[in-house]
């Protein structure tokens, strides 16, 4: 079943790339193609890391001796923390650039991955659950807000559809890599190494894409200021 899901997800991502190429080819007026493509690649990498952390939480908890009740409670804690933190991120986003907040969020998730590598006790798992909750809702909302600023408004519907496809198809790579490393090393903790790599790679691409997107974000900000 897992292999079938991976194959299906790979096909989904491949289709999204083809759809994106079709949009750019059909809509000759779409600007900032490099910035859009690079951001989608960065988004795919770091959001894959986010989904993988969530998916693999059960394995980490079980390895530490959690029963099903404990795992459900940990999941509940994550959701309880995620709701208010998403609201806080939304308020901060009005004062601080989305670029900076996304960078902070990805760095925080990178730390979560590193923390998971060395996690040895149950209390550390609770700390992990809280840390994941702090940034879980914010990073997705911030990514969509950032994407809004770098794409042409007239093509937002199509491009957001492609972004959603990238998000839905981003679950296979991290899970596959974690499974390979875990089976090769026999350690669930070392299985978190690929997660860290996804976040580092995603952050690196995101930093690169900022150079292409800066003028479009500045233009979007000017329009927002004029409307106010």
Task: Label the model's feature ranges.
Residues 138-151:
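Intracellular juxtamembrane helix-capping segments at the cytosolic ends
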Residues 84-98:
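Helix-to-loop junctions at the C-terminal end of transmembrane segments
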Residues 100-115:
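Structural signature of the two symmetry-related core transmembrane helices
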Residues 1-7:
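Short, small-residue-biased leader/transition segments that mark boundaries at the very start
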Residues 193-228:
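Multi-pass alpha-helical transporter architecture, strongest
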Residues 8-40, 227-228:
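Juxtamembrane intracellular "pre-TM" segments in multi-pass secondary transporters
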Residues 55-71:
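Short amphipathic helix-loop junctions that connect adjacent transmembrane helices
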Residues 180-199:
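A membrane-interface helix-boundary motif in multi-pass transporters
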